[in-house]
């Protein structure tokens, strides 16, 4: 399989269709191609946690992380999301790229940890940040992901929550490594957004056992 360069990966991910009507309650914000490419490229090149691995993508939305992981040679990548509309777009994206190593399951992510215990080598995710009406969602996603992964979980979290996450990781006896600090360009998708876009500082974190 041809090795993709970072720029090539980002360029391909720019062709992935995103949410048509994002749902505020589900905190649906797209993972920008640049962020997705940097995240996946680091996981692949630095830690070798994608190629030929079983990968889960929690709260996968329209599938940008799953599709990127598939392009980098994942054995199988399975996306999980509660939203049927997002998964429909995800499915179209997979068909357009003619990928055979991607699957998707509609479900409530919270119901997964018991059913999917340690079934995946790697879990990747850009969870809801748990702001607005969904306090604690990010940590609930993380807890589920840790139950599903055999090797590592890679997740994006607001840098402002770093201390809280470090405490939780210690409590759960999980190793934690901040592997990148990124600027997340959050576009104005909802009516309450006053600015066209806002930059949020996020950490790409690796959790391992």
Curated annotation (Swiss-Prot):
Keywords, sorted A to Z: Cell projection, Methyltransferase, Nucleus, S-adenosyl-L-methionine, Synapse, Transferase
GO cellular component: cell projection; cytosol; fibrillar center; nucleus; postsynapse; presynapse
Example GO molecular function: rRNA (adenine-N6-)-methyltransferase activity
PROSITE patterns linked to this entry: N6_MTASE
Record-listed E.C. numbers: 2.1.1.-
PANTHER family named among the record's database cross-references: RRNA N6-ADENOSINE-METHYLTRANSFERASE METTL5 (PTHR23290:SF0)
Record protein name field: rRNA N(6)-adenosine-methyltransferase METTL5
Coiled coil regions in record: none
Record entry for activity regulation: rRNA N6-adenosine-methyltransferase activity is inhibited by zinc.
GO BP: positive regulation of translation; rRNA methylation; stem cell differentiation
Gene knockout outcome: Mice were born at non-Mendelian rates and develop morphological, such as craniofacial abnormalities, snout deviation due to altered nasal bone development and incomplete fusion of the frontal bone suture. Mice display reduced body size and evidence of metabolic defects. Mice also show behavioral abnormalities. Deletion in embryonic stem cells (ESCs) results in a decrease in global translation rate, spontaneous loss of pluripotency and compromised differentiation potential. Cells show abolished level of N6-methylation of adenine(1832) in 18S rRNA.
Organism lineage string: Eukaryota, Metazoa, Chordata, Craniata, Vertebrata
Main localization (coarse): nucleus
Domain of life: Eukaryota
Entry binding sites for S-adenosyl-L-methionine: 28, 31, 59, 62, 64, 81, 108-109
InterPro entries: DNA_methylase_N6_adenine_CS, rRNA_MeTrfase/Polyamine_Synth, SAM-dependent_MTases_sf, Small_mtfrase_dom
Class in the EC hierarchy, top level: transferase
Catalytic activity: adenosine(1832) in 18S rRNA + S-adenosyl-L-methionine = N(6)-methyladenosine(1832) in 18S rRNA + S-adenosyl-L-homocysteine + H(+)
UniProt record similarity statement: Belongs to the methyltransferase superfamily. PrmA family.
Record localization: Nucleus; Presynapse; Postsynapse
Main function: Catalytic subunit of a heterodimer with TRMT112, which specifically methylates the 6th position of adenine in position 1832 of 18S rRNA. N6-methylation of adenine(1832) in 18S rRNA resides in the decoding center of 18S rRNA and is required for translation and embryonic stem cells (ESCs) pluripotency and differentiation.
Tissue expression summary: Ubiquitously expressed in brain.
Subunit note: Heterodimer; heterodimerizes with TRMT112.
